[in-house]
Amino acid sequence: MRVSRLMLVTLRDAPADAEIISHQLLIRGGFIKRITSGIYAYLPLMWRVIQKINCIIREELNAKGCLEALLPQLHPSDLWKKTGRWEGYTAGEGIMFNLKDRQGRELGLGPTHEEIITQIAGESLHSYKQLPVNLYQIQTKFRDEIRPRFGLMRSREFIMKDAYSFHANEEDLKTSYASMDDAYRKIFERCGIKTVAVEADSGAIGGAASQEFMVTADAGEDLILISKDGKYAANQEKAISIPKAAIPLEKNAPILIETKNQNSINELCLNQNFQADQIIKVIVMLAILENGREQPVLISIRGDQELNETKLSNEISKFLNKNLIALKSITEDDLDRQGLINIPFGSIGPDLEDVMLSNASSWNKKFVRFADKTAAELELFVCGANKTEQHRAFSSWSDVGGLPKVVDIRKAKPGDQCFYDNKQFLIEKRGIEVGHIFQLGRKYSSSLEANFTNEKGSSEPFWMGCYGIGVSRIAQAAVEQSHDQSGIIWPLSISPFEVIIVIANIKDEVQNRLGEDIYKQLRHKGIDVLLDDRDERAGVKFKDADLIGIPWRVVVGRDSSSGKVELLKRSDRSVKLIESEIVVKELIAEISRKKSSISY
């Protein structure tokens, strides 16, 4: 390929909306172009990167016996309604683009394909003898992101590999899960990115075991917590830990204290000489369920801890046996709309009475109540008195009507002791999620009545797994992880080209002839090579070569008259002058050595 025919347009400066370095470099290097918010065109250089990632994915999944297919992007709403996900994905802040056809039938643009693939399996796989089966696709997906940002990291249209496995029993599902874990590690290593596998929440997909693969980077949107010995890693949404022990209150009879203008934990500590870990913080929230029901929730948590809304959502779903559409804090405006008298925010206790909700126009009239383990473990504590600017001190759980349901709904934090080994402590890193694997169990097969006949002749739902990789995300994550001040440093395996030849002066006949000769030799040997044959200043070509990040650069310049060229390695910028007759052999040897070190 010649640069003169590549439609290469590079930019000196990044657009203002490109916040992180990988986004900036992909725009500046002419890899992607923004069409509108969250929607990008993949230009020729980027498409070559994507195709190479796809090739690696296909090789590894095919080696595991997976079968490639292509599923429709338009999904009928009735399938999603059967699994209970239509409302959650389309109402309120739901992420599914949806529309109606000419006959008024509701359709969604698929962000994920569990419903479609489960229907296909239910109609195609009838016997345990046909199992296991693992189907995958590489497909454009859609998410109606509220705030698209960071280029391909959080976009509204993206490329994803998703796979779905079907099994006769749970043990076989676990075997497939382990096999896909192995395949994912090989895929990411071959793509030249360093990942950390972390325990993760299953979210709206559902299921039992779940694991994310994270590229560690300062620009990562996810906070991951890792033990110093590396034996434990989890997304903060999922992480468990041992918090610092609370300082116990001295034993005293319960008292009522006036707390004027002391509506926060900090104000209470400052004015009353208490510690945050001696106070119970009570939070009121509203859970909006898939059936439209609105359920107030009362949460008690130790004052020095933060609420983990993901854990809370899971506990509410489990307790009510319903999926959540949304979870939000209750405000005074919400109370006004329900026709309720004001709840004494800042002075709420764990025993706030249900009568507060008795006149609610649409909410359930009883709280669902939870206490985090940190609050439950306090023998004596300070809490709100359910009256404005009043608190109770030295109270026990028996003084406030007893313990509600005790659950783990706190955020694990850096510095906490590890749950598996209290001699280890958690440290934090930022991560970019590039892969996620789930053991779905029978959630979708049961909802859609997708059954097979087992060895005993009985009908039962499939056991299922699902496995996703963000293809376009891998490409940008590689840039985020591997760049310098001059531009991108592509891993060899996914670089758009392996070698770029820069002819410093295209009008010099010797340089031009030598550059063309090396180009032809490399192409003949199967090397992916790009020839910069533009009539531009050498400095412009060198800057562009640095920016687009091709791993190896051959510079055909003034030394060509003596039969020598410069060979530059992009990753460390090492340069050597080399005889033009051996540069092809050296490049083939270097590229072959690198490829063999990451192949399986």
Swiss-Prot record:
Family affiliation: Belongs to the class-II aminoacyl-tRNA synthetase family. ProS type 1 subfamily.
Gene3D superfamilies cross-referenced by the UniProt entry: Anticodon-binding domain, Bira Bifunctional Protein, Domain 2
UniProt-listed Pfam families: HGTP_anticodon, tRNA-synt_2b
GO MF term list: aminoacyl-tRNA deacylase activity; ATP binding; proline-tRNA ligase activity
Uppermost EC category: ligase
Region forming the signal peptide: none
Keyword vocabulary terms for this entry: Aminoacyl-tRNA synthetase, ATP-binding, Cytoplasm, Ligase, Nucleotide-binding, Protein biosynthesis
Domain notes: Consists of three domains: the N-terminal catalytic domain, the editing domain and the C-terminal anticodon-binding domain.
EC number: 6.1.1.15
SUPFAM superfamilies in the record: Class II aaRS ABD-related, Class II aaRS and biotin synthetases, YbaK/ProRS associated domain
CDD domains reported in the protein's UniProt record: ProRS-INS (cd04334), ProRS_anticodon_short (cd00861), ProRS_core_prok (cd00779)
GO biological process terms, semicolon-separated: prolyl-tRNA aminoacylation
GO cellular component: cytosol
Protein name: Proline--tRNA ligase
Known catalytic reactions: tRNA(Pro) + L-proline + ATP = L-prolyl-tRNA(Pro) + AMP + diphosphate
Chain's role: Catalyzes the attachment of proline to tRNA(Pro) in a two-step reaction: proline is first activated by ATP to form Pro-AMP and then transferred to the acceptor end of tRNA(Pro). As ProRS can inadvertently accommodate and process non-cognate amino acids such as alanine and cysteine, to avoid such errors it has two additional distinct editing activities against alanine. One activity is designated as 'pretransfer' editing and involves the tRNA(Pro)-independent hydrolysis of activated Ala-AMP.
Location in the cell: Cytoplasm
Keyword Aminoacyl-tRNA synthetase: yes
Subunit structure: Homodimer.
